[in-house]
Amino acid sequence: MKALKPVLLALVALQRVFAQTPVDLEKLQQQLGHDEKMLSDWPNLGRYRAENAKLAMPGPGEKRVVFMGDSITDAWGRSGGKFFPGMPYVNRGISGQTTPQMLLRFRPDVIDLKPKAVVILAGTNDIAGNTGPMTLEQIEGNLTSMAELARANKIKVVLSSVMPVCDYIRPQTERRPPAKIVALNGWIEEYARAHKLVYLDYYSAMLDDQKMLKKELTGDGLHPNDAGYAVMEPLAEQAIAKALKGK
């Protein structure tokens, strides 16, 4: 009983603190709910399970393309309800995700959908440490694994550069140092060249003269706004066309 007394006193003290600060308690409850969901389905396999089940297999001659990524992919076309209108493109982005999470869901969210090509945009959240510290080598290994899985299933691969960030609106470069983004992009480009994959360079097209994401292309210094997606869309189309031609 004596051993339990300090624990009980601490719990009483915490209860008093939470009673005095209900907003903090609410945030804690939300965080616990988020953590519970993460622990029960860390790669978020459930996000697209129902949609995948409803999606019919590609028809004859259909050149389905899956976009695998994080929030930048997830938000693409969501505001206007249009994601490459008229094209058989499937959005499988999940906000906040890192490459190990994407690798775990690569089979149900890409391979099982029988696409002709996959566009992979990933790495910024790994650099930020969203799911824990990650070295560049670990990120590269996960990207390599996704590319190899795709090729083993006769899926053409488009590897995208990590997007630049900026501090013009909110501080973003502390968690995502530009030097790390440049280093990872250098590896992605070289890997794509060495393995005859298509490299999709969003980075260069969205960079200003300060080596930052152009202010007019973002609302928070990290995610593209409508103007940003307008820059990205034709680049993605060109890369997909190149991949499907096998060049």
Question: Would you name each region that the model predicts?
Answer:
Residues M68-G69, S160:
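Short hydrophobic segments within beta-strands
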Residues I72-T73, Q97:
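Short active-site-proximal "capping" loops at secondary-structure junctions
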Residues D41-G46, I94-T98, P177:
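Short, flexible loop segments at the rims of nucleotide/cofactor-binding pockets, characterized by
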Residues G81-P88, Q97, Q101-K247:
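Alpha-helical cap/lid subdomain in secreted, periplasmic
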